[in-house]
From Swiss-Prot:
The record marks 70, 88, 99, 145, 166 as: Not glycated. It comes from the Eukaryota. Pfam families: Crystallin, HSP20. One of its GO terms (cellular component) is nucleoplasm. Contributes to the transparency and refractive index of the lens. Acts as a chaperone, preventing aggregation of various proteins under a wide range of stress conditions. Required for the correct formation of lens intermediate filaments as part of a complex composed of BFSP1, BFSP2 and CRYAA. The modification Deamidated glutamine is found at residues 6, 50, 90. Belongs to the small heat shock protein (HSP20) family. Zn(2+) 3 binds at residue 154. The modification N6-acetyllysine is found at residues 70, 99. This is Alpha-crystallin A chain.
Amino acid sequence: MDIAIQHPWFKRTLGPFYPSRLFDQFFGEGLFEYDLLPFLSSTISPYYRQSLFRTVLDSGISEVRSDRDKFVIFLDVKHFSPEDLTVKVQEDFVEIHGKHNERQDDHGYISREFHRRYRLPSNVDQSALSCSLSADGMLTFSGPKIPSGVDAGHSERAIPVSREEKPSSAPSS
């Protein structure tokens, strides 16, 4: 059977009716009503599944911003408390690890774990890195950039995660 490969703009216009990646990042979120509708299931290939109707900030997908003055990572970790998170810097990388043991939720028992690793720009001041967790579960890791020619000082160290009482000011796009 021949399947035509469509241009990405065409794929986006069809939205949820076009098959998406093999895996997404929505583990343990439970089923929604549209997951059970047979007309939404993919008949093109058993290896594809429909993308879920969720916003980017609800998806657990991170956003990395690096502008002239600072480097920032936004990561949705709404299922984790600051005690469940470990953030450390090793050389030119920041590693974010989250793990919580099995606990009961609305759909049964669930345990979650993730590990993310990001390369830091060479001009980030590693002595001024900070990490905070907002009330709505958005982890913000940030650090100022230093002028070129100044040594950024690379070493391994843990970055404490502080809790904020206000929701995140992360962009919704």
